[in-house]
């Protein structure tokens, strides 16, 4: 009798995508609790993550997200800029509550603030950059799922997904895989059906690149106008040192007067007041 296959068997296609996005590339430092997820170490001292554990923990995290009946009670945070777009896209397809950017202190503990929320699950991109949200979650006994690198502290983290949480490609792929697995478990997407959403839509994009493109087009247009401007033919300037023969013998300037022979011929027509 053949042994039953485990549901947490790593998918070869997902593993191949992780290798392409460099999800397995860790750091030179390693936390003691993260050593069990390290596969090996390179000659440069960089620790490599075992992607089998990564995919296994990712499926466990997806099951924890599905257990929350109201998707809006799942908060996904990312203080790291590379994870802001991935968090927004993940929340768009899953229905969670995204917080991209700076975490406002007191979001989970201060009921007076307008941003106060009471979620049931927290998903963090980096335990170091999202330390404030993890600390507040410990005050309210909120379970936490986090993308953890080899040097990430596991304080206040309940489910750690070992991966590279510093590269924009790695962060985007991890949120894409997590969103797809959540849709699988919710039966909104069949496992034999490919997801029509590309991983590229989760990538972080620099807004300065979009601001430079219009300027470049305007400059090229101005250059075309300058190069295509018609040239005006240059006529030779007249030589003022030469004398017109028609006026060569006209020494009397009285001829230049407007129909008058002498300047004294003008009659003063003003009234005599005396």
From Swiss-Prot:
Per the UniProt entry, what are the Gene Ontology biological process annotations, in alphabetical order?
ribosomal small subunit assembly; translation
Compartments, record wording? Cytoplasm
Q: Which UniProt keywords apply?
A: Cytoplasm, Ribonucleoprotein, Ribosomal protein
> So what does this one do?
Required for the assembly and/or stability of the 40S ribosomal subunit. Required for the processing of the 20S rRNA-precursor to mature 18S rRNA in a late step of the maturation of 40S ribosomal subunits.
For this chain, the family text in UniProt reads:
Belongs to the universal ribosomal protein uS2 family.
> Any idea what this protein is called?
Small ribosomal subunit protein uS2
A single GO CC term, please? cytosolic small ribosomal subunit
Short name of one Pfam family: Ribosomal_S2
Organism equals: Theileria parva
What GO molecular function annotation could you give as one example from this UniProt entry?
Answer: structural constituent of ribosome
Q: Which domain of life is it from?
A: Eukaryota
Supply the source organism's classification: Eukaryota, Sar, Alveolata, Apicomplexa, Aconoidasida
Q: Which InterPro entries match?
A: Ribosomal_uS2, Ribosomal_uS2_CS, Ribosomal_uS2_euk, Ribosomal_uS2_euk/arc, Ribosomal_uS2_flav_dom_sf
On subunit structure and binding partners, the annotation says: Component of the small ribosomal subunit. Mature ribosomes consist of a small (40S) and a large (60S) subunit. The 40S subunit contains about 33 different proteins and 1 molecule of RNA (18S). The 60S subunit contains about 49 different proteins and 3 molecules of RNA (25S, 5.8S and 5S). Interacts with ribosomal protein S21.
Give start-end of the signal peptide: none
């Amino acid at each position: 009798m053949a042994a039953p296959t485990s549901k947490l068997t790593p998918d070869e296609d997902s593993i191949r995508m992780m290798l392409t996005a460099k999800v397995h590339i860790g750091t030179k430092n390693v936390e003691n609790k993260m050593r069990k997820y390290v596969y090996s170490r390179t000659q440069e001292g960089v620790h490599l993550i075992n992607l089998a554990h990564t995919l296994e923990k990712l499926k466990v995290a997806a099951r924890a997200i599905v257990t929350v009946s109201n998707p809006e009670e799942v908060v996904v945070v990312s203080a790291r800029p590379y994870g802001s777009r991935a968090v927004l896209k993940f929340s768009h397809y899953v229905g969670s509550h995204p917080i991209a950017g700076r975490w406002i202190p007191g979001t989970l503990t201060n009921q007076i603030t307008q941003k106060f929320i009471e979620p049931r699950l927290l998903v963090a991109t980096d335990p170091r950059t999202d330390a404030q949200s993890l600390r507040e979650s410990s005050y309210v006994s909120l379970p936490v799922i986090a993308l953890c690198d080899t040097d990430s502290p596991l304080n206040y983290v309940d489910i750690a997904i070992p991966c590279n949480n510093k590269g924009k490609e790695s962060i985007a792929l991890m949120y894409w895989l997590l969103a797809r697995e959540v849709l699988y478990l919710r039966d909104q997407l069949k496992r034999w059906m490919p997801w029509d959403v590309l991983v590229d839509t989760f990538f972080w994009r620099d807004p300065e690149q979009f601001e430079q493109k219009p300027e470049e087009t305007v400059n090229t247009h101005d250059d075309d106008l300058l190069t295509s401007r018609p040239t005006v033919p240059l006529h030779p300037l007249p030589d003022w040192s030469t004398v017109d023969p028609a006026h060569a013998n006209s020494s009397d300037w009285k001829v230049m007067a407007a129909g008058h022979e002498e300047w004294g011929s003008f009659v003063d027509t003003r009234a005599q007041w005396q």
